[in-house]
Amino acid sequence: MPTINQLVRKGRKSKSSKSDAPALNYGYNSFKKAQVKNPAPQKRGVATRVGTMTPKKPNSALRKYARVRLSNLIEVTAYIPGIGHNLQEHSVVLIRGGRVKDLPGVRYHIIRGALDTAGVTDRRQGRSKYGTKKPKG
């Protein structure tokens, strides 16, 4: 426990918070061939691998994921939300932050309905989250 005098002299150091989606904080300068700080809400990338993985206990499923090389040359694992997808290797995707709690190492989501990713078909509720257009009628 510090004394009042010690607090007056030094003060308290504020905690620095770690980013939940660190890959979104960097850009790439191709002239300098170096990473630069360039925070962005989303980033574009190319899928290098598409597959399924099993979640942690007590859940059981085959969750779809894609390994994505971003425009800043960082490679991340991103979750593909919704039922069914059209992604394959070399698909251009847009990712956002947001982890998947039962998949270790997955800290990003792919945005459906943007770039090469199609929206979820036959979706009626919560359409905006899955890139689905309003149905006719």
Curated annotation (Swiss-Prot):
GO terms for biological process: translation. The modification 3-methylthioaspartic acid is found at D102. Residues 1-23 are annotated as: Disordered. Gene3D superfamilies: Nucleic acid-binding proteins (2.40.50.140). It holds the Pfam family Ribosom_S12_S23. GO terms for cellular component: small ribosomal subunit. One of its GO terms (molecular function) is tRNA binding. Keywords: Methylation, Ribonucleoprotein, Ribosomal protein, RNA-binding, rRNA-binding, tRNA-binding. CDD domains: Ribosomal_S12. With S4 and S5 plays an important role in translational accuracy. Interacts with and stabilizes bases of the 16S rRNA that are involved in tRNA selection in the A site and with the mRNA backbone. Located at the interface of the 30S and 50S subunits, it traverses the body of the 30S subunit contacting proteins on the other side and probably holding the rRNA structure together. The combined cluster of proteins S8, S12 and S17 appears to hold together the shoulder and platform of the 30S subunit. HAMAP family: Ribosomal_uS12_B. This is Small ribosomal subunit protein uS12. The gene is rpsL.
